[in-house]
From Swiss-Prot:
The gene is Guca1b. It is a lipid-anchor. One of its GO terms (molecular function) is guanylate cyclase regulator activity. Expressed in rod photoreceptors in the retina (at protein level). Expressed in cone photoreceptor cells. Stimulates two retinal guanylyl cyclase (GCs) GUCY2E and GUCY2F when free calcium ions concentration is low, and inhibits GUCY2E and GUCY2F when free calcium ions concentration is elevated. This Ca(2+)-sensitive regulation of GCs is a key event in recovery of the dark state of rod photoreceptors following light exposure. May be involved in cone photoreceptor response and recovery of response in bright light. InterPro entries: EF-hand-dom_pair, EF_Hand_1_Ca_BS, EF_hand_dom, Recoverin. This is Guanylyl cyclase-activating protein 2. Its main location: membrane.
Amino acid sequence: MGQQLSWEEAEAAGEMDVAELQEWYKKFVVECPSGTLFMHEFKRFFKVTGNEEASQYVESMFRAFDKNGDNTIDFLEYVAALNLVLRGSLEHKLKWTFKIYDKDRNGCIDRLELLDIVEAIYKLKKACRAELDLEHQGQLLTPEEVVDRIFLLVDENGDGQLSLTEFIEGARRDKWVMKMLQMDINPGCWITQQRRRSAMF
């Protein structure tokens, strides 16, 4: 009890090692000598200029990464966010995803907030058509149908809003809900492509 993990155990658990952290820092300093990353730079790194759907998704990601709400991402916020997205536990990813959906930061997700993100994710996934085809052989639901079904399965008190507890428990309880939410938790094809194209990553 209370023992610290060795580097090998930390790596096995999916945590970053010092060499990886140093590499990320070097890239961050080269791209952001001021020590902060602004929205327009964040979009540039993800190659979303001129792509409205991707831009909307990346703006939501930026707001979730910007923990202190100062409209910039510093190195610690950047590392924490990327480590979470790429390696975090399911519960941590769900909490982070909830923040992306909760645009007005009122602690609940309404239908419009959920629909906005689901629509953006659907459009992003079209860039990874092979992934969509593999995931959704057969009938593909519309974003509106996805939102209706999620609310039917997850909104336990029927108030038209999803609390963090409803969001997490609903995802854990229902495999379909989890799969739909994982479209945001881990947009694997898209985020991997963007990381490879970007000098930042």
